[in-house]
Regions:
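Active-site neighborhood of phospho(di)ester-bond hydrolases with catalytic His/Asp-centered motifs
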Residues: 5-9, 26-32, 36, 65, ...
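Conserved beta-strand hairpin/beta-sheet module of binuclear metal-dependent hydrolase folds
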Residues: 1-20, 110-128, 145
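Cap/insert and terminal regions of metallo-dependent hydrolase folds
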Residues: 132-217
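Metal-dependent catalytic neighborhoods of phosphoester/phosphodiester hydrolases
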Residues: 40-48, 73-74, 190-198
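Short gly/ser/thr-rich secondary-structure transition/capping motifs
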Residues: 9-11, 80-86, 125-131, 162
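Short, well-ordered beta-strand micro-motif
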Residues: 93, 114-116, 216-218
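Active-site metal-binding motif and surrounding structural segment of the metallo-beta-lactamase
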Residues: 3, 10-59
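Metallo-beta-lactamase
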Residues: 54-110, 118-119
């Protein structure tokens, strides 16, 4: 198989090691450079740098946007990792996946990703971090799995950085996705309520779940 890590926030490496040797990663791709999405990236680079069993001729490929040149340059570490740019106007092929991008609404430049497995046609869409955008209805159209930034409860619509539960559900319905998974969950409030609000907006035909540590979704 091909092991692609999407974002590398705090504690990512610790949890990853419970399932996969980080040396077996084939690539990393980043939606944006906020700390909660890249906090463990440097730790991962050190892991590759110092591990005695690593093939020194193999560099870890890390993909990111170039609109923050300082952070993009940090993706490359000599003899360890190589930073590769992606662009909204271009389709990117990484291993068995074809990836397209859409810029989101967020305080820093961030991109959503539509990832298609070439051999099966299965579609995974990750919003990155974003406020509500109608264009997600087309970007996520017919996705098998729609992973949506849902930090806010219903009643906080049109936020400048994150979806509400209602917005996530409405977009899932408009896009006709098969499964909606809520991520970037709030540290406050009743998460079952958040899920129920999203389910109500999505309708009965779409399965809605909460993301959780160690949870696996088969597409």
């Amino acid at each position: 198989g091909f092991n692609l890590l999407i974002d590398a926030g705090s504690a990512t490496l610790i949890k990853l090691q419970e399932h996969l040797d980080p040396l077996d990663l084939d690539a990393v791709i980043l939606s944006h450079y906020h700390h909660d999405h890249i906090a463990d990236l440097g730790v991962l680079q050190y892991y590759w740098q110092l591990h005695p069993k690593r093939n020194p001729e193999t560099l870890l490929s890390i993909y990111g946007h170039t609109k923050d040149s300082i952070h993009f340059e940090e993706l490359t570490m000599e003899n360890v990792s190589k930073g590769h740019p992606y662009f909204e106007a271009e389709e990117l092929k990484i291993g068995p996946f074809l990836i397209t991008f859409m810029e989101t609404i967020h305080p820093v430049v961030c991109y959503a990703m539509r990832i298609v497995e070439e051999t099966t046609g299965k579609v995974f869409v990750f919003t990155g971090d974003s406020g509500y955008l109608e264009s997600f209805a087309d970007f996520a159209k017919d996705a098998d799995l729609f992973l949506a930034d849902t930090y806010l409860f219903e009643g906080n619509e049109h936020h400048h950085a994150h979806f509400t539960s209602k917005e996530a559900g409405e977009l899932a319905k408009s896009a006709n996705v098969k499964k909606l998974v809520l991520t970037h969950l709030p540290q406050f409030g009743d998460l079952e309520q958040l899920k129920n609000e999203a389910q109500k907006a999505a309708g009965k035909g779409i399965d809605v779940e909460l993301a959780a540590v160690d949870k696996v979704f088969n597409i």
